[in-house]
């Protein structure tokens, strides 16, 4: 790729990616305001967030395959258009049901955008700069995730919760215009094929059903007991559907995801590292806002600024780990990054209610640094094992691994803390923690907090062991383009 075209492409897709990631984090802070306006319970309004997770998990993988078939430019543009339409519907929603439907439309567009963004970027950067490109994308994700809590507070306070959807729609519209002007299918590594001849419909249906049911069972919005008929049935049916999916994908000549990639040790070990790494690293952005607001006494806006320190560490580390991994290989950065994650998870487990702000922000920064160090090199290692024609489905698969790992990590976190609190008679919802002045509730939460991060430290250490098994993959393909 000559000239600076690859950088034009990067900024074109980065605008939309930033908005889509920010949307996912910004909506959580609006849930209480939405519940108040529609006069519904907080449990009911959480379906606004759950609908997004289900939609993205169900459609991410099939949509990645569609992008490989139909051409990435039009796919990316249609995804952004759907996202904007969904945002406008959410802005004008008259009841909770309409808002949830609008979030499904937004998330479908977001799934299309995220399914193809890595494929587009890797398609225009030369193989020798793959790590640098992925590092830049990881930085964009970090900035988007951090911007959500920072922007949400003042925007909701000044203009109400509906305004957050305009905040995410405006940069996406700019991304649509840029995509029409900049993106060229002949240069971003995509080509148009026959959808009917090649699309794996049965695999897509099995994948959507299995992952939707699995995510729904793990997130447990109905508050079933973990040892209950409904929960056990949910896991068993998910397992049956996943087994059926694997059997079908191995038999069909044009699979949605080529499972034979897992025969490559580099692919299988790096994917395992990614999955476990996101389980071990996802609880920080879920639990720390609760800790900062409920125990340290900071408001929503201040909590967002404190959490930004972690995103700053992730963004900075992604920059140099991505660039340097092109020169020195991915292994060193993956080891060090996951090592930082193990260390900070252990450190988090010793936090108490009067932990100093300096210590909290320092550990958050190191935690973000660790995440940034391993994410881009790990992804580069995985993508090095597949050909350009599979970049779309592989980009979607890697995003799916991240999403499912994060959901499992957050569900594991909530289950451990809720279990400890329940065993000690402290039956208080996490969102109501700041309203309780009972010392027993505080002690029970902190005991669950400590156990949670020790468990996550073990999970992250296992991810580190998987990373040690990941070797450099040498291919005779020409990836220079």
Report residues per predicted region:
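Short juxtamembrane and helix-loop transition motifs at transmembrane-helix boundaries
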Residues: 97, 125-127, 192-198, 296-300
């Amino acid at each position: 790729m000559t000239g600076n075209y690859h950088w034009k492409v990067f900024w074109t897709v980065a605008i939309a990616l930033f908005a889509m990631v920010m949307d996912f984090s910004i909506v959580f802070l609006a849930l209480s305001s939405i519940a108040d306006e529609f006069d519904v319970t907080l449990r009911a309004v959480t379906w606004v967030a759950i609908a997004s997770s289900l939609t993205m998990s169900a459609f991410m993988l099939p949509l990645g395959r569609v992008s490989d078939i139909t051409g990435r430019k039009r796919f990316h543009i249609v995804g952004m258009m759907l996202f904007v339409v969904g945002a406008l519907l959410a802005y004008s929603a008259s009841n909770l049901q309409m808002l949830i439907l609008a979030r499904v439309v937004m998330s479908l567009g977001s799934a299309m955008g995220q399914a193809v963004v890595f494929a587009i970027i890797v398609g225009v950067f030369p193989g020798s700069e793959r790590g640098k490109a992925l590092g830049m994308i990881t930085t964009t994700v970090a900035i988007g995730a951090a911007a959500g809590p920072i922007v949400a507070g003042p925007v909701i306070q000044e203009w109400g919760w509906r305004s957050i959807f305009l905040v995410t729609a405006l940069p996406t519209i700019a991304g649509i215009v840029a995509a029409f002007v900049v993106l060229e299918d002949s240069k971003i590594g995509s080509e148009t094929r026959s959808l009917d001849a090649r699309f794996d419909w049965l695999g897509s249906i099995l994948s959507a059903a299995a992952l939707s049911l699995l995510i729904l069972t793990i997130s447990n919005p109905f508050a079933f007991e973990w040892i209950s008929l409904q929960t056990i049935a949910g896991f068993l049916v998910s397992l049956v559907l996943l087994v059926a999916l694997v059997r079908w994908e191995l038999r069909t000549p044009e699979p949605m995801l080529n499972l034979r990639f897992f025969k490559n040790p580099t692919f299988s070990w790096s994917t395992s590292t990614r999955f476990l790494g996101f389980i071990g690293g996802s609880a920080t952005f879920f639990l720390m806002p609760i800790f900062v607001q409920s125990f340290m006494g900071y408001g929503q806006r201040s909590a967002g600024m404190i959490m930004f320190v972690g995103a700053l560490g992730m963004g900075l580390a992604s920059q140099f780990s991505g660039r340097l991994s092109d020169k020195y290989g991915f292994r060193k950065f993956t080891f060090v990054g996951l090592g930082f994650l193990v260390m900070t998870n252990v450190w988090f487990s010793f936090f108490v209610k009067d932990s100093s702000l300096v210590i909290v922000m320092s550990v958050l920064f190191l935690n973000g640094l660790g995440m940034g160090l391993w994410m881009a090199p790990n992804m580069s290692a995985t993508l090095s094992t597949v050909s350009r024609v599979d970049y779309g489905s592989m980009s979607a698969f890697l995003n799916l691994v991240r999403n499912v790992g994060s959901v499992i990590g957050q569900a594991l976190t909530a289950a451990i803390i809720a279990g400890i609190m329940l065993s000690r008679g402290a039956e208080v919802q996490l969102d109501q923690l700041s309203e309780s002045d009972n010392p027993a509730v505080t002690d029970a939460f902190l005991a669950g907090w400590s156990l949670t991060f020790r468990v996550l430290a073990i999970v992250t250490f296992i991810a580190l062991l998987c990373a040690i098994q990941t070797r450099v993959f040498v291919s005779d393909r020409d990836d220079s383009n």
